[in-house]
Curated annotation (Swiss-Prot):
Keywords: Cell inner membrane, Cell membrane, GTP-binding, Ion transport, Iron, Iron transport, Membrane, Nucleotide-binding, Transmembrane, Transmembrane helix, Transport. It comes from Shigella flexneri. This is Fe(2+) transporter FeoB. Pfam families: FeoB_C (PF07664), FeoB_Cyto (PF17910), FeoB_N (PF02421), Gate (PF07670). GTP 3 binds at D56, L57, P58, G59. The gene is feoB.
Amino acid sequence: MKKLTIGLIGNPNSGKTTLFNQLTGARQRVGNWAGVTVERKEGQFSTTDHQVTLVDLPGTYSLTTISSQTSLDEQIACHYILSGDADLLINVVDASNLERNLYLTLQLLELGIPCIVALNMLDIAEKQNIRIEIDALSARLGCPVIPLVSTRGRGIEALKLAIDRYKANENVELVHYAQPLLNEADSLAKVMPSDIPLKQRRWLGLQMLEGDIYSRAYAGEASQHLDATLARLRNEMDDPALHIADARYQCIAAICDVVSNTLTAEPSRFTTAVDKIVLNRFLGLPIFLFVMYLMFLLAINIGGALQPLFNVGSVALFVHGIQWIGYTLHFPDWLTIFLAQGLGGGINTVLPLVPQIGMMYLFLSFLEDSGYMARAAFVMDRLMQALGLPGKSFVPLIVGFGCNVPSVMGARTLDAPRERLMTIMMAPFMSCGARLAIFAVFAAAFFGQNGALAVFSLYMLGIVMAVLTGLMLKYTIMRGEATPFVMELPVYHVPHVKSLIIQTWQRLKGFVLRAGKVIIIVSIFLSAFNSFSLSGKIVDNINDSALASVSRVITPVFKPIGVHEDNWQATVGLFTGAMAKEVVVGTLNTLYTAENIQDEEFNPAEFNLGEELFSAVDETWQSLKDTFSLSVLMNPIEASKGNGEMGTGAMGVMDQKFGSAAAAYSYLIFVLLYVPCISVMGAIARESSRGWMGFSILWGLNIAYSLATLFYQVASYSQHPTYSLVCILAVILFNIVAIGLLRRARSRVDIELLATRKSVSSCCAASTTGDCH
């Protein structure tokens, strides 16, 4: 079979991702475009004659970039197309928005690269009474047009057949430009590098005349003639860029008049009706908060009900199983405990996170694909405008519910450096999936039936602190007004199940692999440091270990937030959590289990793997029945019952160490707000600078310590009023001084972002080094 590389390009919300998932299935690889932190996805699929590598290009409305301050999407798409890496392009076009989508199509066809138009979302177009003559459109464009409904898999085989039959586009003159424009474009083309095909040189000439700043990188000496060329043109026409765009839109209008009835189309009645409620100025925000709460409720309840299968099952296989092998094969006791607690305990920490994190990713994917997430940005626009930010900046913040790294990277879609930087500083406060894993464990241990409500309150606290951070920056070192907010709202539709599963799987797989590697390594090292004293001797009591001795010295620093000296394990969790937040659970599980295991002797004669696995399945089944019982549905704030008994195991020790729900909640506040993980810190440094990364770390530590201290000291005020009052006043005074210093430093702060654009050629190469996707 012949190998073929295809670039997949289209407007945002055109169904490009769904088509990519339909074609490639699970055969996908996620990384970054070389030199930039924009995600690059590749997938593999086969046709009758070809083995295809499909490259998913960023969604973009055109290939023209007027300002270097705009997002990188147009630059990356243009660079890849001009690089010659793609043998063929598939342009995904939204049939319900044909006129707008055809602008990008015309630019692609003018380049002369073989192209297939995938006319998607025909089902939505039909509901709006839009009729499109496929053959007529194909004849006018001079390339194959394949009708598709990617959410249902309709037209996929026809698209594969068209790929096998692909050939150069017919030489059809689509756009009739004014003769002076063509003459000057040809004059520029003559002085461009001769290795570029003539048609592409003419296209680059038009792009330069339109004001595209990145086409100059390919133009060679022609870029030096641009100013003189524009001066000559302005003697004949006012604005060359306007004439070029107008010629294209006239061509699009002529095509649409012949092949479709878009002018008489009816808007989606369902979308219009729902938007009257969802976008209502009074109901929009409560609906958004309810949707967020529902997401956490499902993640905690349904994910928690599935947890015994992963928790009890992994204990049976990787903890008790390793212990049984160790005793049976007469391993040394220290080696058996080391393997069971370190390796087995690390695996046992990762696997129980899967159901709850997976449920949250599934729900997020559903909200994104259904079209609701775009509405959430509009709902939050008024609030974001108060911060001096457009509502568009809330979109990357919502992405932060999954992971803060793409949230920081998503700030690139904003136009102004000030808006990008403010959004980057706010992003770490959005509670990610790794934090949900911590919250879920503490919710089951301390908050009983109010577990989901406790988790919801922490997520809302993260949003509130992000908003307050934005306000602080606006009135201190980043004063300014927001740019107007314009964003396309896609039509509501039911997401395709296959696409949902693939998106959820990609996110969950990335989380588990990343978390698993770190947690298992940390668990092994913690087990080692927990087994020896500072003098190097093996200890029987972990409270005499080197880790305990060092941690006890540091723990008093966290006394104001409710961490007592004997709870040194919680201090270790905060330090390891700086690597990755999910490691907090692994650390606490390893250390609390080590303390508990001293009182629990494992008897290999009583070990029965089949019984323990059956117990895991039975407990999961009972939990699912309880979760979907009528009583729970009538009273939805019912915490997960799949986390095990509180009287035994690591959770029992944790309950004793913290001593109260107030201390546990204060600890969670600190975990929510303090230092972001290493991946996020790296993303902040790349997207801004190391200085701003340092500011983000210090500000987060201050907010976390201040808020956790205020909460715990108010909650426990009656126990030690004098100490609590001193702590509260000290925190308030420190923050007043800090904000005052920031106001004075405003004139000396540079809010420009680091230059992140590499050479033209480097952006076309693939990089498989991902951060956190």
